[in-house]
Curated annotation (Swiss-Prot):
InterPro entries hit by this protein: AMP-bd_C, AMP-bd_C_sf, AMP-dep_synth/lig_dom, ANL_N_sf
Disulfide-bond pairs as recorded: none
Protein name: Nicotinic acid-CoA ligase olcI
Keyword Mitochondrion applies: no
Gene designation per UniProt: olcI
UniProt binding sites for AMP: 194-205
One function term, GO molecular function aspect: CoA-ligase activity
A Pfam family it matches: AMP-binding_C
UniProt KW Acyltransferase keyword: no
Amino acid sequence: MDLVSFAFSGPATHADQAPLYIDAKRPSRSLSEAPFRRLVRSLVAGFKAYGVERGDTVLVQLDNLVIHSALLFGIVGAGGVYMGCSPSSPRHELDHFVSLVEPRLILTVASALSVVRDVCTNKGISWSQICLVDDQSVDHLVSFAQNQSYNPQATPPVRDEGVHFDLKDMVSFGESDWMRIYDEATARITPAAMFSTSGTSGLPKAAIRTHHTIISHHQTVHYDVPYPVTRLMALPMSHSFGDFWSNLFPIRYGHPLYVMPRFDLSTFLNVVHRYNITETYLVPAMVHILNQSTLPVRESLGSLFYIGVSGAPIDADSLQRCQKLLNPQACIGQLWGMTEVGVIFQNRYGDQRYPGSIGKLLENYDIRLVRLDDGTTIHGESTPGELYVRGPGIMLAYQGRDDGIDAQGWFRTGDIAYSEDEHYHIVGRTKELIKVRGYSVAPAEIEAVLLKDPRVHDTMVIGITLPDGSTEVPRAYVVCALGQARPTADEVSALALKNLASYKALDGGVIFVESLPRTGIGKPHRSKLSHLDAQRTKLAALLSPV
């Protein structure tokens, strides 16, 4: 089956035609089942009219929008491949994406238009392949979808090779059925979407997800819950984690989705309270913001039953602090996944036995833990090893590369994990481990300790090499909390020394900064911080007295 058919063939009857995709800031901008279907079919016709053929990529460079899911299904329904990226992507990253996926069309916003034009000019791409998306065009598409009496003629707008076009032109071509796939073999090899990897250790890669992998992944993760589901999405929908909870659930199961353009604490709390949100998904940085907030968080989150957390490591103490902000029937739990493999570990609603774990392995997936020293497979519990994964929801490949998945179907995650009573725990990443006199130190463990101090708003730990080259040691970069007394470097170091083994001490020092580099979804960008740290060291050497 193809992805669009799967979306529209769910158990939801939509008898009441209740809103499914809702703009959290302007709830009147919403789409119920019939308008959503009409919009998808019209966008299928529009993307075809603008030259999208089977296998062509459409690069979607947008913040979260109420029409985002319709755009994705319109692209896929036309036979194309959706690829999302942030409108704030720097020029070099956008240039990389355009070279990597060779898009037929680029959907972008006014603030990014000049950068997109420059990149297209350098790549020999006509500006007529650029589609501008603004508030007016979103309004137009929503109104068009809701107004069943409006039937535009399939007359192509006048196109100028040197000028971008507007998204509202996409719905000027009538409706078209979507591309159908009836056999599993074809669905297994037909790309539907690509999602960029985090790029924390270099330029991002594009992981190809086929119709079959997306459907299989969804069927594995979905489960019934004993509460009415109304979700709030504040994560980037262009990222695989945000995408998963945004697109299929509303139309397939009738679960309303409120869409925020981006996370803002005050707006987030207001939307949860006002619209009785029962389920949402966050990254650890957002959990820390909730824990440290002086706003009436507990009163605002009373309707929530479940918060799923993923995207980066988070400690049990931070999760338990957030748990105390929720109603007694609610729970917060970690998930684990990657862009390349999807979500494969999950703490489901009601399972809170191991709050620091990433949950149980989901059905239909295989994993193995491999020792770092000799590469042998670990069979017992409580022994950390590098995590390898295989299963039906794993990516087809990286775009333009032949690495990533071995001949037996295993994907090497780079994460270090161990098991305990069928629940798994993440220790850290192999590339991020700090080698201190023969010991392996995970930065996330030190960060979790420092974040317990209310004076620490954010922190990131990296490894630096001592001047004599004898060993690496941890160095902490710290952002102080507003409205709190500023801690000294010695106080921060003492906090780590008091709670951790001596070889995990911050012997590389503590440096206070205004902000820390993170990816769009909140992952620590340690490679960028390490680069900045190296520049800082060079500058300090130049400025030091002779």
